[in-house]
Amino acid sequence: MTSTPSSPTGPDRVPVPARLAEATRARGLVVPHITLTHRDPTRPVWGMLDPQRAWNTLWGKLCQICGQRLDDRVIVFIRSIDYLRGLAVEPGAHPECAHYSRRACPMLAGQQHHYHANPAVRFAHCEDPDCECRYWRPREPDPREPSREGRPAEAWYEAWLPITDYRIIDDPGSEHAAPAVGVDLTGVRFLKLRKIRDTAAPSTNRSPEPLDMLIASRELFGY
């Protein structure tokens, strides 16, 4: 996911941190390490993860943006549904890389209000005969989880945790959740927790966000 050059957070307006100075770019935007790309890495499929690279990034404790080893403090982008499950399925990031992503990604920046209605259209094949894009296929939805296609964007939060609490687990799933590898959030005491965008869902009959309530409790009791 990323914004277009003409958007308020386009590449000409989002400063690139020194850690990302040598990163691959497309239209001026840094291509995250875990983003699916054609054989030409400057041709990303924005918003789609490379499954193998994401898996390696999780278990290797690498940054999802720059691909380098994570340091003492890690930022993980999460939703309330992730917190309730106790699992964040995307790898963490360095604070400076996360800061860049938060401004450059339209979903995190609050500019994209709905998920793509038809993700399959982004799997178009390129003209390079050696590119593996001809093998790409949309992921089959798991019946235990609701589809996000075309649905309003959820509220997103950034959670800071020490690298000592950054544990990767292979969750077998349940009757309500598909199996997944991710960051274990169970029992983790966040160093910081803040909301970075509101949900785009209509306000009528909207349930309170569990992470909003957690933030309020942290402020009330000072932890």
Predicted feature locations:
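Short linker/helix segments within small regulatory modules
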Residues: 79-91
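Short, non-ligating residues that shape and space the ligands of small metal-coordination modules
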Residues: 70-73, 103
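Cys/His-rich metal-chelating microdomains
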Residues: 66-69, 100
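N-terminal alpha-helical interaction blocks
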Residues: 1-56, 134, 139-223
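Short cysteine/histidine-rich zinc-coordinating motifs and their immediately flanking basic loops
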Residues: 74-82, 106-111, 143
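Short cysteine-rich clusters marking metal-coordination/redox-active sites
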Residues: 63-67, 94
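Short metal-coordination and nucleic-acid-contact micro-motifs, chiefly zinc-binding Cys/His arrays
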Residues: 56-62, 87-90
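Short metal-binding segments enriched for Cys and/or His
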Residues: 91-113
